[in-house]
């Protein structure tokens, strides 16, 4: 209710109803569901590119709704319902001012225990040095189970890609920014779902 407000809380979670005002947050490229891609178990992949955040273009609630929408879209897959979802974050290039602690404070508690989806793994690839300062704050809002599923992959892109491959994430399921073959085009995916009334 807090995130969607009384005017949207009971509307269908579709792009033309509950998320009708969230197009910018959905398409800015911060949160991306890699539709059609999964790990060997069938877990959907959410790709977070922190350097694309721009708090001046959307509200925190709008971004939370956008991520909720993508997580619910991921749950359209039976494998994701069974085995969960994994996150790949690519915070390289993000500045300290782009880290939105307020968004984290709203987002993590709203997802954990609310959305019926398992968080299988959280792969943070090439994190900036200042992440050591931010991570303790982020962990305040994570369940113990989630904290145990955070993995850090440092080094050059090739090394990171090889590490992801050791977890079953092949080039065909890794974004190009991390040495994979996936072209991330969330705007096209959102536009196709909007046209389909989803």
Predicted regions and their residues:
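Basic, amphipathic alpha-helical/coil surface patches used to engage anionic, phosphate-bearing ligands
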Residues: 1-198
């Amino acid at each position: 209710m807090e995130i969607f407000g009384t005017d949207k809380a009971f509307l269908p979670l579709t792009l033309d109803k509950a998320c009708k005002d969230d197009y910018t947050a959905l398409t800015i490229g911060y949160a991306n569901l890699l539709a059609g891609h999964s790990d060997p178990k069938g877990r959907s992949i959410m790709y977070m590119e922190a350097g694309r955040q721009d708090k001046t273009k959307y509200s925190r609630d709008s971004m939370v709704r956008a991520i909720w929408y993508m997580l619910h879209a991921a749950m359209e897959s039976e494998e994701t319902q069974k085995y969960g979802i994994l996150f790949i974050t690519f915070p390289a290039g993000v500045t300290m001012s782009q880290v939105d602690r307020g968004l984290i404070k709203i987002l993590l508690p709203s997802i954990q225990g609310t959305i019926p989806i398992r968080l299988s793994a959280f792969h943070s690839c090439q994190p900036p040095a200042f992440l050591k300062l931010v991570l303790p704050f982020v962990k305040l809002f994570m369940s113990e189970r989630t904290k145990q599923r955070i993995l850090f992959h440092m080094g050059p892109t090739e090394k990171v890609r090889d590490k992801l491959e050791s977890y079953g994430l092949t080039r065909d399921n890794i974004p190009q920014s991390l040495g994979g073959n996936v072209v991330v085009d969330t705007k096209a995916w959102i536009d196709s779902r909007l046209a389909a009334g989803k």
